[in-house]
Amino acid sequence: LRDGWSGRCLSNTSQKVNVTSVELLTIMKAKSKPMSEANPSPLVSGEVGDDGRADSQRSLARQIIDIVRGEADLFHDQEKRGHVLVDWEGHRDIFRIGSEDFSHYLAHVAWRHFGEALSSYAQEKITGTLESIARFEGEKRMLYLRTAWDQGILWYDLGDWKAVKITTSGWEVVENPPILFRRFAHGKVQVDPVEGGELRNLLQYLNIDPKKQRGMEILLLTYLVAVLIPDVPRPILAPHGLPGSAKSTYSRVIKSLIDPSLLEVMTYPSQSQELIQMLAHHYLICFDNLSDLSERQSDELCRACTGQAFSKRALYSDDNDVIYCYKRALLINGVSLVATKSDLLDRSLIFELEPIPPNKRIDEETIMKRFEEEKPKLLGAIFSALSKAMALREQGVIELKMKPRLADYALWASAAAMALGYSVNDFIGAYQENVELQNA
């Protein structure tokens, strides 16, 4: 038997083939196997099929690799994963090589240029080749989630190939920003911000009475500004209250304003691997209606807040670990305060929400409708305050005599307080009250 011959050639009675008993036994075993093993794809074995499709697919694969290299930019990210950057209909799309979107892109290239479909094996070989090119020949580029610094400019991704450019002199919406952002299927397009809003108007949607709860007001509004600073460990928002205190509405409003998603609130995952996936895909995660937290879960939240490393198995077929370091914004709500471990309490902003009296309750649909109508101005107010806070930090006028835990955040929140019309002492006083709640 010659290499590359398949069992079906031996069954052709018009040819004489001399085989030994051992070879015959091997052939019989092969013929008894499933078709995928006994008669592999022509592209796998190297054999040319009767219709020449194997050669056609091989040629098509080579041509598609050349086309992709010509029309797309191949690069790898900070986690050494390959991507293609494609200019398409006036905007730039990023596809992670090996993803479902990337497979659709390859299929479209084949159809657009040749009017042919790709075999699964051809797709696999194209994918493997382009992944290696992106990893070993492509440039390393950072991919960001929702916000990013670049040369003193802060960028906020709106999710529709637009971003907000924030500087010390103001902000503007920019088409096709120079920063590359990750996007995921759950993500929703953020509204375009507009000027002229008042951030304090947000409190009416959050069951916070500024006359009675000024400290909570200051802590929350400064948080909404400072949370957009990337790579700074932020405190965890921890609202709690009895049923009817609008905890879930509070969480949905915050999530929508900062990091809009189809997944507004989520349950805490049972496995650490699921949590890593969530951290990779969300800038702000809201865990809803928690009853308690185990020691492991408390530790995970602390690590996710401060950016300590998580490891995740790359493939079940090997022992390679992928190391992830995320500093994520987190919100945890429950009937009682679920942050009970000292390390987690030290990293939390505690908000005790009171039940809304029956005569003052408004259904959530109405609240969210009103919020969505005002959201562009609220978002614009955040960016205006953030621009002022950046200018204050640049001028060096923010100084803290005693730096609390999460000191970098406290500096930004103090600048945000001044930008919003409060004083640094107002923020520090509210922050200290929060510490006292932790120790109560």
Where do the model's predicted regions map?
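Feature primarily recognizes SF3-like P-loop helicase cores of small DNA viruses
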Residues: 232-235, 261-267, 272-284, 293-297, ...
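Catalytic acidic motif of RecA-like/P-loop NTPases
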Residues: 291-292, 302, 306
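P-loop NTPase catalytic core of nucleic-acid-dependent motor ATPases
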Residues: 85-91, 170-281
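Non-catalytic accessory segments of DNA primases and related replication-initiation nucleases
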Residues: 1-27
